[in-house]
Amino acid sequence: MLPVLISETNESELIIQDLALRLGLDLLMRGEEEKELQLADDQYYLVRGKKKSHLQIGLKGKQKPILCNFTDWSNNKKKSNLLRCMKGLPSDCSVVDATAGFGRDALELATVSDSVVLIERVPWLHYLLQDGIKNSTEEYVLSLVSKFELIQSDARDF
């Protein structure tokens, strides 16, 4: 099930309609939320916020938003299995994350490599990755996401 785009910004309707078209999503305009509330407890929404965009289930705000939060993830000091597998790689290597998803693996890969190519085929997920990169502000996180090359494509075509 594809998410539905909702905008919490003051951008023009044309800009939001263009974004929905580029992402291949239906658009729910402001004021239409009320009629959707009863129908939408299990519907995913891509919310274009004023500062950050996120994915959420339902419109009632019961669930935590799902977003690319590279700053929070960088503070997780627990060593992952992915990093254990990458042990011994030369530090000047380039890595391809062919299924970028929300970018958590790519962030870890950036700690042990010179560059990371993130390939994501799903347009709205690619959009959330761009938003997460744009909203990274801490110096350490910026040093990691600056290694990213984000590509919207099917990895089989890359």
Task: Give the label of every model feature segment.
Residues S94, D114-S115, K147:
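Residues at the starts of beta-strands that form the adenosine-phosphate
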